[in-house]
């Protein structure tokens, strides 16, 4: 084989290796950049879940608490009616009045018993706390995954060969998630 062909084959082989290296470098950068974008989308999705969920949960718990307050008020009034009947029994003059008052007591007791469902506002508040905690944990997890993805991407594009060959406009350095000023203070949920 002629030396010219050997040199040309070596140059062609070297160019092929450089091209394949650049091809791999570029595709890896694209894959990592899309991974960063996906993770940020997941963070945004978790924020949206919180924005949708928390006001609805708060209103649901408020409504249940209000309903239970109304029920307790009615039960208290029914009990007060029974106390009033007890005073009438003391003042009753004949057995017929006592029988009518006895029926009133039975009716009041039955109404109080039927109107006194199992009170669940404490369970609702605990459920709200669990939902809030779960939502905040999801958001935090998505932020962590985003930051890990940004780190992997930035490490790749700032590497020696990548920084020499990749266009910094197409593959800029990404910023990790940073908390807003005052975010170290947790938000207050008001009822």
Residue ranges and their predicted role:
Residues 1-191:
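A helix-centric hydrophobic-segment signal that preferentially recognizes long
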């Amino acid at each position: 084989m002629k030396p010219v062909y050997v040199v040309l084959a070596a140059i062609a082989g070297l160019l092929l290796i450089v091209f394949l290296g650049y091809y791999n470098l570029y595709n890896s950068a694209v894959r990592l950049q899309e991974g960063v974008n996906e993770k940020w989308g997941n963070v945004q999705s978790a924020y949206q879940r919180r924005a949708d969920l928390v006001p609805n949960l708060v209103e649901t718990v408020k409504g249940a608490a209000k309903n239970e307050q109304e029920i307790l008020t009615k039960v208290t009034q029914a009990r007060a009616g029974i106390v009033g009947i007890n005073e009438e029994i003391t003042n009753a003059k004949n057995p017929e009045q006592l029988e009518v008052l006895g029926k009133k007591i039975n009716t009041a007791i039955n109404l109080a018993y039927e109107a006194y469902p199992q009170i669940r506002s404490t369970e609702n508040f605990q459920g709200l706390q669990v939902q809030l905690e779960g939502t905040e944990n999801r958001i935090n997890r998505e932020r962590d995954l985003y930051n890990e993805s940004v780190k992997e991407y930035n490490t790749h594009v700032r590497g020696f060969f990548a920084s020499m060959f990749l266009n910094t406009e197409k593959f800029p350095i990404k910023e990790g998630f940073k908390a807003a000023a005052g975010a170290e203070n947790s938000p207050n949920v008001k009822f």
